[in-house]
Regions:
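A generic structural micro-feature
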Residues: 77, 300, 368, 412, ...
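Long, low-complexity serine/threonine/glycine- and acidic-rich segments characteristic of extracellular
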Residues: 484-492, 504-506, 512-617
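Extracellular, repeat-based ectodomains that mediate carbohydrate processing or recognition
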Residues: 24-486
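Aromatic/hydrophobic beta-strand junction motif of beta-rich domains
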Residues: 57, 349, 432, 507-513, ...
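Bacterial N-terminal signal peptides that target proteins for export
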Residues: 1-9
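Bacterial N-terminal signal peptides
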Residues: 9-20
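Surface-exposed coil/turn segments at beta-strand junctions on protein surfaces, enriched
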Residues: 221, 274, 340, 413, ...
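Short beta-strand segments of immunoglobulin-like
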Residues: 494-500
Length: 617
């Protein structure tokens, strides 16, 4: 059964159980909004008047991975120094890029490739933002997100802007005005984004001992009031608590309200307001074992939690936190939340398939969703599901170091967050980046994520309680992406395969990858070998292996042969590697070549085609 109570003891036993048949919340297969433009940090908003859904994402400049700062095609061709924007007029069945002449919006109103956000004012005007180095833009649309008639490419200097629509033609922009300082302020435009106030309302505090707090996350407006998440910061610079900042029109500054003391793993908490102005906050904690060190050199991570707390008085007081998600075998992180009618919320999060330091250790990342229709109850009922099933949307590490990730050649393709929202029916929409696809021409992995869109297809909506199985759009075949490549690549050592001298050992071979064939619902995936990895080890029965190192010497001790030291060969279809050796001791040796394809399928050793045994006497 997938119905679980929202207490820690009841929920720890099961993290992502299937919901019961009576409340079977289900989702569509991931739909690719675009097969060329980047999709990190995506958001959606529905326009009930123009019957459109607007989808926006980071353009990808600071999300590039493999090979570092190099901008491969098609990214370089499509670069516009603007956030990406699409609209759908058929409830998400198809998507169209906005703009003309190579721009997503008028460049005199929109500037900046990163940090998008969406909001709508009380007059129905939709706003977006982007950051270009240190300047935040605001631009807006009155036709459902298709064109942008108002805006300012330099509303104010700052970093990581968030928006909240106010009265007609009014929008608020929250941003960090100074790097390396708690400088969070909120600015205002009253003319659709054409002009912005230059004096902000602060929501940050630095204490004499260096501790403090800062506004940190998505901003919301309701009835002449603003509310946003805040993170509390200790004297060592780490997050040690979560809360909210609130403001009512005319106040000189925001007022901080702490929810609880806690560690944080993600960049910020997330909040949502339901139609009765109840406020919900979610965050991920970050327990670690300080007695152990992981492969990144940091403290060893432990299983963690997604927590939620509720306020019935617009953030002044908060309920005791409950656990929304937990697994003993992985990490849950980057939660987001959307609310509908009073007490009805959806929480989404990423989940790894193993305990890992995600900054440098690979894992398979999937999506989890918690559907809560009685969130105001003392013990809410949480129906959990996996919107993409066991399918991974990312198989790699997840760097959280911001712009330094690209410089250090770490994987930041997912950006810093993903989101859920509601369509015009009140059914849940999930927007995420996806790194599983490959270039249809070369078969190479994309250096950035692609935008995906997942729609609730069954179960109760968060508004009106309708069945989300009604009125579903039918996406096109091409939007569902490529077939899943489960076939491992093949490597063959070319005879004689091995050449050994007193100082060097050389291997050569060929490798190939079949990819997978298309179907009625999936596009084909071109096969591509990404790399060939080679290991050389002295083997001894019942003792294990001593692997050859870069120094040309063997490891000092025998250990499990399943943990090799690997060299990357030059070339892929035809490859070779020349390894230095220094005084190899006598004994039996084994050289193994393994190919890895663009879908991260890894070849296993065989005794015939990719393994050579030799002896040193």
């Amino acid at each position: 059964m997938g119905r679980v109570r929202g207490s820690l003891l009841a929920f720890v036993a099961i993290a992502l159980a299937l919901p019961s048949a009576a409340s079977a919340v289900g989702f569509s297969p991931p739909q690719f909004v675009d097969r060329e433009l980047a999709g990190g940090e995506p958001l959606t908003i529905a326009d009930p008047v123009h019957h459109t859904i607007v989808y926006t994402s980071h353009e990808g400049t600071t999300h590039l991975y493999r090979p570092g700062i190099f901008a491969p095609l098609p990214f370089g061709v499509n670069y516009r120094n603007q956030v990406n924007i699409w609209t759908s007029s058929d409830d998400g069945a198809s998507w169209q890029r906005t703009g003309v002449a190579g721009a997503s919006a008028d460049p005199t109103k929109s500037n900046g490739f990163s940090d998008p956000d969406l909001t709508m004012d009380e007059g129905g005007r939709i706003y977006n933002t982007g950051i270009n180095l240190v300047s935040d833009s605001i631009f807006s649309s009155i036709d459902g997100g298709k064109t942008y008639d108002k805006g300012n490419p330099d509303c104010h200097n700052g970093d990581r802007p968030w928006l909240a629509g106010g009265k007609k033609d009014e929008v608020f922009l929250a941003t960090n005005t100074l790097e390396g300082a708690l400088s969070h302020q909120i600015f205002q435009s009253t003319d659709g984004g054409n002009n912005c106030s230059q004096t902000g309302v602060p929501d940050a505090q630095t204490n004499s001992d260096g501790s403090g707090y800062t506004g940190n996350g998505k901003l919301y407006y309701s009835k002449d009031r603003l509310i946003e998440p805040i993170s509390y910061i200790g004297t060592d610079g780490s997050y040690n608590g979560v809360g909210v900042g609130t403001w009512k029109r005319g106040d000189p500054q925001f007022t901080a309200h702490k929810i609880t003391d806690t560690t944080e793993f993600g960049h910020w908490p997330a909040i949502a307001l339901d139609k009765a102005d109840n406020v919900y906050a979610v965050w991920d904690d970050n327990p670690v074992d300080k007695t152990k060190t992981d492969s990144c050199g940091g403290t060893h991570p432990l299983p963690n939690n997604i927590k939620m707390s509720v306020s019935r008085d617009f953030g002044s007081t908060w309920s005791a936190p409950i656990t929304v998600a937990h697994t003993d075998t992985g990490r849950v992180f980057w939660p987001w939340i959307v609310a509908g009618d009073a007490g009805k919320v959806s929480v989404v999060w990423y989940q790894s398939n193993k305990i890992a330091d995600l900054d440098c250790e690979d894992s398979n990342i999937t999506i989890g969703e918690g559907h809560i229709l009685n969130a105001l109850a003392a013990s809410p009922t949480i129906d959990t599901t996996q919107p993409v099933g066991k399918r991974a949307i990312h198989t790699s590490s997840v760097c959280q170091g911001g712009t330094t990730c690209v410089a250090e050649n770490k994987d930041r393709r997912l950006g810093d967050f993903f989101t859920n929202g509601l369509d015009s029916r009140g059914c849940v929409l999930i927007s995420s980046g996806d790194t599983t696809q490959t270039d249809p021409t070369t078969g190479q992995q994309f250096a950035y994520s692609l935008p995906i869109f997942i729609q609730q297809t069954s179960g109760q909506s968060l508004v009106g309680g309708i069945d989300c199985a009604t009125g579903l759009p039918k996406p096109s075949r091409s939007s569902l992406g490529q077939c899943r490549d489960r076939t491992k690549p093949v490597t063959k050592l070319v005879p004689p395969g091995l050449h050994r001298t007193r100082k060097f050992l050389s291997l050569k071979g060929v490798a190939s990858d079949a990819g997978c064939k298309g179907s009625a619902t999936r596009l084909k995936r071109r096969g591509r070998v990404e790399s060939v990895l080679v290991s050389v080890a002295k083997v001894k029965p019942r003792h294990g292996c001593r692997f050859l190192l870069v120094s040309g010497k063997l490891e000092p001790k025998f250990h499990n042969c399943a943990k090799p030291f690997l060299f990357m060969a030059k070339g892929t279809k035809r490859w070779h590697v020349k390894l230095r050796v220094r005084g190899l001791p006598s004994g039996d040796y084994r050289a193994v070549a393994r190919a890895v394809d663009a879908s991260q399928n890894k070849e296993r050793p065989t005794h015939r085609r990719n393994v050579i045994r030799f002896a040193v006497r």
